[in-house]
Design a protein with these regions (language model features):
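C-terminal accessory extensions appended to soluble enzyme cores
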Residues: 145-155, 159-193
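Conserved AdoMet/S-adenosylmethionine-binding subsite of the radical SAM
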Residues: 1-157, 161-164
Length: 193
């Protein structure tokens, strides 16, 4: 009988008997609980290309708490990156969403890149905020409460669309793109091309 993961619901369907060999497999999470299945991830990685993406919008604990009220602390997520990287699992940090005037500047991104590299992340990816109607209904009241000085900017940026226009998106991600080109990222994982 093939071994199945025991504790985590997401891992139950994963087979590690070789029948799914040579697959690319990834998991995106904010939760440090993924390390409960480190043995399964390591075993899967022997025959597959396993990558875990840990979402961290900010390494500043106060800002992170404002952005993600119920998410695990960013320091706990960075420790998760370290544990996965130490086990040889390719681990990427996702800075998502990047939000104008909130977490898009050097004061937010430089520490995130430094901490992600120090933790052993193979890369840092980012994506701009987008606001579909259901999200917009929750987002703007939150923005008025947390960042009232930015409400006008966001209303202009998202007045007639769910996604930022190309010029606004390019401006938003400019610092991220520059930092990602600095030495150290993306880094290859030993044993992989």
């Amino acid at each position: 009988m093939p071994r199945q993961a025991g504790q985590s619901g997401w891992a139950k369907p994963l087979r590690v008997d070789g029948s799914n060999a040579r697959c690319q497999w990834s998991r995106t999470t904010k939760s440090p609980l993924i390390v409960r299945d480190l043995d399964l991830l390591t075993e899967l990685d022997r025959r597959n290309a396993v990558e875990v993406h840990i979402t961290i919008t900010s390494v500043d604990p106060r800002l992170a708490r404002r952005l993600e009220v119920q998410a695990p602390d960013p320091q706990a997520r960075l420790r998760t990156v370290s544990r996965l990287a130490e086990a040889g699992i390719s681990t990427r940090v996702n800075c998502m969403p990047v939000m104008p005037g909130i977490n898009d500047g050097e004061e937010a991104l430089v520490p995130l890149f430094e901490r992600a590299k120090a933790a052993g992340a193979t890369d840092v990816h980012a994506a701009a905020l987008f606001l579909r109607p259901a999200t917009r209904a929750v987002f703007f009241p939150w923005l008025e409460e947390e960042f009232p000085g930015l409400v006008g900017l966001y209303r202009r940026l998202f007045a007639h669309r769910d996604y930022l226009g190309e010029a606004a998106k390019d401006a938003l991600l400019k610092t991220y793109r520059r930092l990602r080109l600095e030495p150290g990222l993306p880094r290859p994982l030993a044993g992989r091309a």
